[in-house]
Amino acid sequence: MALRLNTVQPTFAPAPPKDSKTSATQAMSTNEDKLKTLIGHAKEYGFVFQSSEIYDGLSATYDYGPYGVELKNNIRRYWWEAMTKLNENLVGLDAAIFMHPSTWKASGHVDAFNDPLIDNKDSKKRYRADVLLEEHIAKYADKIEKEVEKGKKKFGDGFDEVQFRATNPNVKRAQERIDAVEGRMKAALDANDLEALRQLIIDEEIKCPISGTANWTEVRQFNLMFATELGSVSGESSTIYLRPETAQGIFVNFLNVQKSARMKIPFGIAQTGKAFRNEIVARQFVFRMREFEQMEMQFFIKPGSQQEWYEHWKAKRMAWHRALGLPADNYRFHDHIKLAHYADAACDIEFRFPMGFKELEGIHSRTDFDLGNHEKLSGKKLRYFDTETNESYVPYVVETSIGLDRMFLALLSAAFQQETLENGEVRDVLRLPAPLAPVKVAVLPLIKKDGLPEKARAIIDTLKLDHNCQYDEKDSIGKRYRRQDAIGTPYCITVDHETLTDNAVTIRERDSMAQERVKIEALPQVVNEKVDLRGLLRKL
């Protein structure tokens, strides 16, 4: 069957005109509709549920259902094996969530882990001031890209993009605005000048996307750490924190890992686990939650080599994403305007979510900030002795940090499509990369009798030790195909009456819906070639 794509696609609507409340509302509504469609699909098919739903839910907390947890596990495994299997100088760690409170004093989180927040008085909505400005800057960047695209179409093969960007008056004006806003924003953030940040928002006439007004409150700082009490007796307890990042567990264990695993610099430590942030502005489904999962790697290097390794890991991490086969224009690098308190270089890999380009992964050059501060506050040496140069030093660190929940949303939003077939039927399909799909193979007996169910279950028995398989005999074969399409199952195996005589089955591929006949004894090899994770790892 020929396919015709419907309009429900995970793309970002054009930015509305600055002075158009109606256009802004319509654009936001379009993006919200796309996200709502995705959220509805995720709930209906067992990927994500609102946490505590029977009690009307808890804001910005979600539970992963049967297929969601499988997809999460597969993403985690892909990351873990890409880190620890493909790099001999990378090992793993699983540190505790609770840590000595001095950890967070040394790391700077007690004093500097804040978000600048601003409220719109009319809509009563709260926003991060820096994000409002970054989204405003992005609109100018979009204007530049549109001008460049127009130039490419006009001049064809003779188009000189570098010269065009340098000479086109519209591009130059937009770039001047970007430079001006970024300059003022960086100065305000570096100086922690909240009034200057608010004034910049007012000067740029940035409006609330809900109310369409620029009626803003003052900007205030909010610390993002969750505090709790350790101890059961009142007056004898002490304040500890739910970790806001997994990285500090790696830093305090640096020497333990280095000595026990006999590692030499450069080497890395990888960890996945839960982190917690008291996000005041928590929204957009699983994109920004108060409880989330990180996949972080800290790479320890000799001081002075950080720029080389920073570029190395930028390239490596983008290659990891691109190996999944998603369109290249879904990704871009974004350099930080304001560096975190621990960094001398930082950038994000941004992804085109339904709500636009947003941070997916961060790559940071953390210098010796963390190890140096832990050494000072703890009084314990956290130094590496280099036998080749006969010197001792506190290593520098390059970090890669990706939110597992955001990666989940990125894959789900890019994979979800609603297709209209030639016969007018609409099918929901998740075009997930086959090695990451929650269910790899569905085995479907054509009918529930004549020995077909028994044959189907025998096939599952040969495959289930290697792959997550699903048996389904309810409803017509067409409806069963649609169910598997909706959860992203890459291959369906149909057992029919001919199977009993020719010992062959029909394999249907999810994306093309093409079918082929395969002998049962060849199934393990055929399926492995199509869905094995090693196929992704070989691309790296």
Question: What are the language-model segments listed below?
Answer:
Residues 7, 11-24:
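Short, positively charged and aromatic/hydrophobic N-terminal segments
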Residues 21-540:
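NTP/phosphate- and nucleic-acid-binding module
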